[in-house]
């Protein structure tokens, strides 16, 4: 309590508040959020592309202009070679000037094999130091940054609380990548708030949650995509946002090296009164 100043209520009544600062669509700077998707959907590449944009790169995803600032991306699941492949693929879509801007503004520190644990004092302090002076920190994935039971609300509240403490003290937003539950993935419900694997605290205690979901057979039919091509399409949206106007979900197409770019799709009209196969 001693570290937090009380709010001057009369001053808040009278003075106009400063505008909200968004680090990602609907995500206020200095808060904690999540990107949830099934394994293999492309969330690591999406996170890398968003990190590169905030670091000073172009808006390849067409999610809108985002204020720039230093970013740190901590992949603890993939080896450096895999990160190199993603960067090489992404670099093919950047100009020399854009490459330099991203290199200057983005720090990538692979942690595979380091067993990071945000609940351990030395790791908490190290992550806090890494966040200082930065606009965004990406943790890839949440499971790699703690050793607690994911289905237990108490331990998960503490894990989220550690992230909130870092964000509050440094002003750096934290986005953790997380897997969708098997049930949500099988039912094509990856765009729902409760698609997140583990305790509901992982949804309830954060201010922002986005998703990346693979195209289902029904969606492929709706958008006129051949079934053997739908694996190239993923949908990105925000399933929980405590601030800001609604963010419209959008389709991305996976290109060489896994790079995501906006997909050009047209919703198909349904025929009326004509049985399938007779049109």
From Swiss-Prot:
The record's listing under Pfam families reads: AAA_25
Q: Which InterPro entries match?
A: P-loop_NTPase (IPR027417), RepA (IPR038724)
Q: Which domain of life is it from?
A: Bacteria
Source gene?
repA
Q: What does this protein do?
A: This protein is involved in regulating the plasmid copy-number. Increasing the level of this protein results in a higher plasmid copy-number.
Protein's GO biological process: plasmid maintenance
Gene Ontology MF terms: ATP binding
Q: Which organism is it from?
A: Escherichia coli
Protein's name in the database: Regulatory protein RepA
Q: Does the keyword Mitochondrion apply?
A: no
Gene3D superfamilies according to UniProt? P-loop containing nucleotide triphosphate hydrolases (3.40.50.300)
Q: Could you tell me the keywords of this UniProt record?
A: ATP-binding, Nucleotide-binding, Plasmid, Plasmid copy control
Matching SUPFAM superfamilies, A to Z? Answer: P-loop containing nucleoside triphosphate hydrolases
